[in-house]
Amino acid sequence: EKYDRITSVATFEHICNLPEVVAFSALLLIKSGNLRVSIPNEGSWLWKMAWTTTTGVEFFLKYRVSYSILMKHEHVNTASEIEECLKYFFEKVEGSYFGLSKRLSIYHFYSCSAPRIDRCNEFLLTDQ
């Protein structure tokens, strides 16, 4: 079955086999289909400041453990790594950002279209 749209909200930063997931998602889209991805700006100083001053404080007050220990293992992909992966498997990747600019944002949103079917198939065949 093929889909018009596949949407991912705050998941790609957690996926260890991200290229495989993106390639497979691209193959599940109809020709004019769209993959929509929203992610935190993991790897940026602004994102780190955001979670350390909110969730990090709350987590420490509740459990007396540094949240940074968890974050090292929770977010395995940075925003730039995710964007690079999307651009490899899709011809058209448009980004918008929650913040002043790409670098000064907390959250990123990507709309990906025109999957590069040949790259997806090649990656999935050689990844076995």
Label every PLM stretch briefly:
Residues E1-K2:
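Short conserved loop adjoining the S-adenosyl-L-methionine
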Residues T11-H14:
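Hydrophobic adenine-recognition pocket in adenosine-nucleotide-binding enzymes
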